[in-house]
């Protein structure tokens, strides 16, 4: 399994629409950097957020998620409360090749401020916006800047094509647009 370079990322994005919109240069003056880098792509966070709150007094349950747990926010700067959490999404829309898995790591600019970014792997065949999980681990409010970098994606090409892709198994987050809340597939339990 090999880590893919800027040349490969550019080719896949321009020819096959792997990343849309695609920023060919790494933009970084006066902003949290984003765009193409040597061996990855720095994704941007859109201007829509879902901020967790305890106003509803409910328990967070991934199998039965209650939207009373969140407050919707749209704007250029999102303030994540102390020791709290927010969901966001990428500006970029991804179409993953069948033989490529992507992993995403938070940017050091935010990590050095106590802001942890988590994104689960982009599976082969996945298509959609990426939902981003943002944790403010500090006792202070934290700013997240919309339309700027939030994390870096690394692309790993498998030694062979997988037998079953995310698209083949009709993954529950396939073709997601916007911020997608937790989902549990209904049906027969095995």
UniProtKB/Swiss-Prot annotation:
Which key words tag this protein in UniProt? Hydrolase, Nucleotide metabolism, Nucleotide-binding
Query: What superkingdom does the record give?
Result: Bacteria
Any matching Pfam family:
DCD
Q: Does the keyword Hydrolase apply?
A: yes
- What InterPro entries would the database entry show? dCTP_deaminase, dUTPase-like_sf, dUTPase_trimeric
Has keyword Lyase? Answer: no
- Can you state which reaction this protein catalyses? dCTP + H2O + H(+) = dUTP + NH4(+)
Where, by residue number, is the active site? 133 (proton donor/acceptor)
According to UniProt, this protein's pathway is: Pyrimidine metabolism; dUMP biosynthesis; dUMP from dCTP (dUTP route): step 1/2
Enzyme Commission code(s) on record: 3.5.4.13
Q: GO: which molecular function terms?
A: dCTP deaminase activity; nucleotide binding
Q: GO annotations under biological process? A: dUMP biosynthetic process; dUTP biosynthetic process; nucleobase-containing small molecule interconversion
Q: Which HAMAP family match?
A: dCTP_deaminase
Sum up the protein's function in the record's words.
Answer: Catalyzes the deamination of dCTP to dUTP.
Q: How does it assemble?
A: Homotrimer.
Q: Which PANTHER family match?
A: DCTP DEAMINASE
> What's the family?
Belongs to the dCTP deaminase family.
Which protein is depicted? dCTP deaminase
Top-level taxonomy = Bacteria, Pseudomonadati, Campylobacterota, Epsilonproteobacteria, Campylobacterales
Give the encoding gene's name. Answer: dcd
